[in-house]
């Protein structure tokens, strides 16, 4: 790859010749004003705000559309450039409304900022300003199309990243406008990102409208635990209230995007929260303090042991989503100290991390030459990864085949079958797809597999590794997809986040439900303890409730599906008398007199964690192990069924979000089943 030298403002730079001029300047910290250009979108060249002067050219050049050439001499701050930008701004402002004081983009508006620097002090436009009808994009995006400057960022994002080809440009001249070709809604799980992309106030957040100004907000960095990727986010608060959630750039994970679920579900952190420990007496809940709650549970356990003449407590745990590593580790210790044995059977291959993690770095997905989706609805479970696959299909014509339930994909796929028996035929070489994924024809295949797939039970693991190059030198294309944010963490500690594999233990007399929001099928006579942050069905059916904090109210470590450990920050104070999950469990351990597990603060707990799980301190390198020593199990054939299609209302957080409920009802009313 050839490097060339060029000059910008009389400073010499060396850069790759495949870059455009604006990309080369941005890489070398030379700022060039722009509206339509964005690093993650294709080049449009609409706004002409990025004009620069080349001494070899008569007219200014659009730096976003010109590749760097050798010995190029560019100036970005000459009088000619400034006059050109002033003229461009004059045309943009000619039809722009003068409603800046009531615009939600105020303080973050690129048009305002660049008008101050490059704009004129007067206007020469005396005609009527044009008027454009606002579009209905749904309950998330507010449109005021009079402010639109036709940068087409939203159009390119919807087509190239979100994969919904519903936005476009119609008309010419003064009648040109951006909108839907037919009346439609922005039906994408990434639609909120157009709010960040819009350089003016044409597209703004509808829930955030008229609530606060950017300079009134305090910003904190955190992560999105509502899916297993853990995208990087920025949480803006005012006082004790979350006002909005925005993305943070992370090229290894979410790039510049986040999902609508984390962006708009922030209102749920103030609704249906559990504030105090409660005990159920005669069918009604009574508030009690933490001391009384600990005394109650200790007395109950002592009475149970004495009545049943038992030396251990038959306690069964249910582990839910959104649990941090400290909580999972402490919960495992709590179960062990009470004599419980709630671990996965060895047939699930829990001793190999590669069999329950996302092994291919997202930055290397473009190296894949083939992709198979097995029993997974990628658009619902990991929308960011789905967006990356969509871009590979568009740019590299990546072939994608689906084995499992067919959902509404936003890119071209070939659906093979609903039966798991077809996968066996493929791996045996008797199917037409066998030739395409064999070691001879595919050097770097990508397998995206749902966590409920039969493949994970071991029956087809060995044929997969023997027939394909899914794991070879310098490549691991085996990727497990899960809706559960703490899926990998529970596997690392050899715990199950699902009760289905232990259905024969339904008659346990005591159940401990740890932030588990799915239905718990237990005997009505069983004593149930619920620990969580939102009041849900399992809380109502419990005998004792411990209120805990959510991820925005504590400093905790979380591991995503790629085994990348990140930390959340305590942004808000915990409501009422709620406590961190691990602190509640640690208090229970102390309450039962287990003195040999002493944890007094988070630093002690991190020390325990680093000893038991090395990937806490050291980023896990991807190992390419030999799986040949595993015995092949008996085949079990069945048809794949649809996984959860309700993207907006899935868990205790989104179920308590008014905004998510509006989204669900709006799309349901319109009859959209786009997942």
From Swiss-Prot:
It comes from Acanthamoeba castellanii. This is NADH-ubiquinone oxidoreductase 75 kDa subunit. GO terms for biological process: ATP synthesis coupled electron transport. Residues 80-119 form the 4Fe-4S His(Cys)3-ligated-type domain. Its EC number is 7.1.1.2. It is an enzyme of class 7 (translocase). [4Fe-4S] cluster 2 binds at residues 148, 151, 154, 198. Belongs to the complex I 75 kDa subunit family. Binds 1 [2Fe-2S] cluster per subunit. Its main location: mitochondrion.
């Amino acid at each position: 790859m050839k490097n060339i030298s060029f000059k910008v403002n009389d400073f010499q730079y060396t850069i790759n010749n495949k870059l455009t001029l604006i990309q080369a300047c941005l890489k070398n910290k030379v700022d060039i004003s722009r509206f339509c250009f964005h690093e993650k979108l294709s080049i449009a060249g609409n706004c002409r705000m990025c004009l620069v002067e080349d001494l070899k050219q008569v007219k200014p050049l659009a730096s976003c559309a010109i590749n760097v050439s050798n010995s190029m001499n560019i100036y970005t701050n000459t009088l000619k450039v400034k006059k050109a930008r002033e003229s461009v701004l004059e045309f943009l402002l000619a039809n722009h409304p003068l409603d800046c004081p009531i615009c939600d983009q105020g303080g973050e508006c690129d048009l305002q900022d660049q008008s101050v620097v490059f704009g004129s002090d007067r206007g020469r436009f005396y005609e009527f300003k044009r008027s454009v009808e606002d579009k209905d994009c749904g309950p998330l995006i507010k449109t005021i199309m009079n402010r639109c400057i036709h940068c087409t960022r939203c159009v390119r994002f919807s087509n190239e990243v979100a994969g919904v080809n519903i936005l476009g440009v119609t008309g010419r001249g003064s009648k040109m406008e951006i909108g839907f070709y037919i009346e439609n809604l922005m039906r994408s799980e990434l639609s909120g990102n157009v709010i960040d992309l819009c350089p003016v106030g044409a597209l703004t957040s509808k829930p955030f409208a008229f609530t606060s100004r950017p300079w009134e907000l305090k910003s904190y960095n955190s992560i999105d635990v509502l899916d297993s990727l853990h995208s990087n986010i920025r949480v803006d608060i005012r006082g004790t209230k979350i006002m909005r959630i925005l993305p943070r750039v992370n090229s290894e994970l979410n790039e510049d995007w986040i999902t609508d679920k984390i962006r708009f579900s922030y209102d749920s952190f103030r609704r249906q929260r559990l504030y105090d420990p409660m005990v159920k007496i005669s069918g009604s809940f009574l508030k009690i303090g933490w001391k009384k709650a600990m005394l109650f549970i200790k007395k109950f356990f002592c009475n149970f042991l004495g009545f049943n003449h038992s030396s251990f407590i038959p306690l069964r745990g249910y582990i839910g989503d959104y649990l941090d590593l400290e909580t999972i580790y402490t919960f495992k210790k709590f179960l062990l100290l009470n004599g419980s044995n709630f671990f996965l059977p060895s047939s699930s291959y829990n001793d190999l991390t590669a069999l329950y993690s996302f092994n291919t770095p997202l930055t290397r997905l473009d190296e894949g030459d083939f992709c198979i989706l097995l029993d997974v609805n990628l658009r619902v479970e990991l929308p960011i990864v789905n967006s990356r696959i969509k871009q590979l299909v568009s740019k590299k014509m990546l072939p994608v085949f689906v084995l499992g339930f067919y959902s509404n994909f936003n890119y071209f796929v070939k659906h093979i079958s609903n039966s798991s028996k077809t996968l066996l035929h493929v791996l045996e070489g008797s199917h037409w797809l066998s030739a395409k994924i064999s070691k001879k024809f595919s050097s770097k295949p990508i397998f995206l597999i749902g966590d409920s797939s039969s493949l994970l039970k071991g029956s087809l693991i060995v044929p997969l590794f023997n027939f394909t190059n899914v794991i070879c030198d310098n490549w691991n294309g085996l990727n497990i997809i899960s809706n559960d944010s703490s899926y990998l963490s529970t596997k690392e500690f050899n715990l199950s986040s699902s009760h289905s594999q232990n259905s024969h233990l339904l008659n346990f007399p005591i159940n401990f439900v740890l932030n588990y929001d799915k239905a718990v099928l237990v005997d009505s006579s069983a004593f149930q303890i619920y620990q969580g942050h939102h009041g849900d069905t399992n809380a109502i059916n419990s005998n004792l409730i411990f209120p805990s904090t959510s991820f925005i109210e504590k400093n905790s470590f979380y591991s995503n599906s790629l085994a990348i450990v990140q930390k959340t920050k305590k942004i808000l104070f915990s409501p009422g008398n709620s406590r961190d999950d691990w602190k509640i469990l640690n208090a229970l351990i102390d309450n039962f007199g287990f003195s040999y597990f002493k944890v007094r603060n988070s630093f002690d707990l991190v020390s325990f964690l680093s000893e038991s799980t090395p990937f806490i301190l050291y980023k896990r390198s991807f190992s390419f192990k030999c799986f040949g020593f595993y015995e092949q199990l008996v085949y079990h054939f069945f048809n794949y069924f649809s996984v959860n299609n309700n993207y907006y209302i899935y868990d205790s957080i989104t179920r308590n979000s008014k905004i998510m409920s509006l989204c669900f009802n709006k799309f349901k009313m319109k009859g959209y089943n786009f997942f």
